[in-house]
Swiss-Prot record:
Binding site for S-adenosyl-L-methionine: 183, 211, 216, 232, 294
GO CC aspect terms: cytosol
EC number from the UniProt entry: 2.1.1.-, 2.1.1.35
GO molecular-function term, one example from the UniProt record: tRNA (uracil(54)-C5)-methyltransferase activity, S-adenosyl methionine-dependent
Catalytic activity: uridine(54) in tRNA + S-adenosyl-L-methionine = 5-methyluridine(54) in tRNA + S-adenosyl-L-homocysteine + H(+); uridine(341) in tmRNA + S-adenosyl-L-methionine = 5-methyluridine(341) in tmRNA + S-adenosyl-L-homocysteine + H(+)
Gene name of the encoded protein: trmA
Name of the protein described by the UniProt record: tRNA/tmRNA (uracil-C(5))-methyltransferase
Pfam families linked to this entry: tRNA_U5-meth_tr (PF05958)
Main function: Dual-specificity methyltransferase that catalyzes the formation of 5-methyluridine at position 54 (m5U54) in all tRNAs, and that of position 341 (m5U341) in tmRNA (transfer-mRNA).
Lineage: Bacteria, Pseudomonadati, Pseudomonadota, Gammaproteobacteria, Moraxellales
């Protein structure tokens, strides 16, 4: 029997509460997701039969080896705009062999306002005939299209969408680039940003952020600090973050293209980086009292954990409670949890997004 939304949420609450009980956190703050139409992106295989074309996903059988093809005619967890476009796009592909020949995947990326980018992926070279057909399709459906094949990328319109998220009455614009990481659940993302700003409660000193991505948290958090230094290694994310800072007219943020490990080396004076000099970033000019981290699923490495322990406040957003738990074993030696939250980014899956504010004991 399948669980209701509230049942699956309650099981996550119980699991997280039990897992972190040894750290004696305050009461868990819970932020729910819409039950349907919450995903702003979706990826499907395009399945070909003798006389049909349809969206497909794969489901492994019980032994985990054989994959079963599941036909997908609608996708209730995806945003309404994706569900509305899916059949229209499929009919256009079926009607035009130039667009359907050797296509094997279609990826959708949308925004709360309905702006749409569709990536069509092929097992063949994309020629001028394809480009002409794709331009006509983009115009007809009022979407942006990206064509991809091995070693080839053809952009019809733009390779990004612009999301607008509201935090405490202010709207922030975010460039979200195709194939770069973005938060998939925009409604819950707004709740995460609002919570992060609420728990910080302002500072007359500076914020250090590691793993900043496209500046998702950086922009709203910057309003609560004198200056912000944010680090990110991926070039496309750094580019998007710089665009977002400029578009939102925020002037107290600098972006350093460094990994967390590299920043630790630079901060401790162990290594100099030309990238910092070229960006005119003087780390020693900052007076940090707070560090914000939103690391990948693997969590934070030991050297970076040592860096975190030197900060008065640590705001940690985690997409993996197991690595957060392991990191807290170290951080709880010097800090205590003063805020604790669960964000249901991924309803009906085992994945849990959580947040903790840690303050120096």
């Amino acid at each position: 029997m399948s669980q209701t939304y509230q049942q699956q949420l309650q099981s996550k609450i119980e699991r997280i509460t039990h897992q972190f009980a040894e750290f004696n956190p305050p009461a868990l703050e819970v932020f729910e997701s819409p039950e349907q139409h919450f995903r702003m992106r979706a990826e499907f295989r395009i399945w070909h039969t003798d006389n049909d074309l349809f969206y497909a996903m794969f489901e492994r059988n019980e032994d985990g080896k054989q994959k079963e093809v599941i036909r997908v005619d609608e996708f209730p967890i995806a945003d309404q705009s994706i569900n509305q476009l899916m059949p229209r796009l499929l009919e256009e592909l079926k009607a035009n062999p130039t667009l359907s020949q050797r296509i094997f995947e279609a990826d959708f990326l949308t925004t709360l306002s309905g702006e749409m980018l569709v990536t069509l992926i092929y097992h063949r070279k994309l020629d001028t005939e394809w480009e002409s057909a794709a331009k006509a399709l983009a115009e007809k459906l009022n979407i942006k299209i990206m064509g991809r094949s091995r070693g080839q990328k053809v952009i019809i319109g733009d390779d990004y969408v612009v999301e607008q998220l509201n935090v405490h009455g202010r709207t922030f614009k975010y460039k979200q680039i195709e194939s770069s990481f973005t938060q998939p659940n925009a409604e819950v993302c707004q709740k995460m940003l609002t919570w992060a700003c609420d728990v910080i409660q302002g500072s007359n000193q500076d914020l250090l952020e590691l793993y900043c991505g496209n500046g998702n948290f950086t922009l709203p958090l910057s309003l609560h600090f004198r200056r912000v230094l944010a680090t990110e290694l991926a070039k496309s994310s750094v580019y998007a973050a710089q665009w977002n800072i400029e578009q939102n007219q925020i002037e107290n943020i600098q972006i350093a293209r460094l990994s967390a490990e590299e920043f630790t080396q630079a901060y401790q004076g162990e290594r100099e980086f030309r990238r910092l000099q070229e960006a005119n970033i003087d780390i020693q000019s900052y007076e940090f009292d707070t560090i914000f981290v939103d690391p990948p699923r693997a969590g934070i490495d030991d050297e970076t954990l040592k860096l975190l322990k030197g900060f008065k406040r640590i705001l940690y957003i985690s997409c993996n409670p197991d690595t957060l738990y392991n990191n807290l074993k170290t951080l709880s030696q010097t800090h205590k949890i003063t805020r604790f939250a669960l964000f249901d980014q991924f309803p009906f899956t085992h994945h849990v997004e959580s947040g903790v504010l840690l303050e120096l004991i």
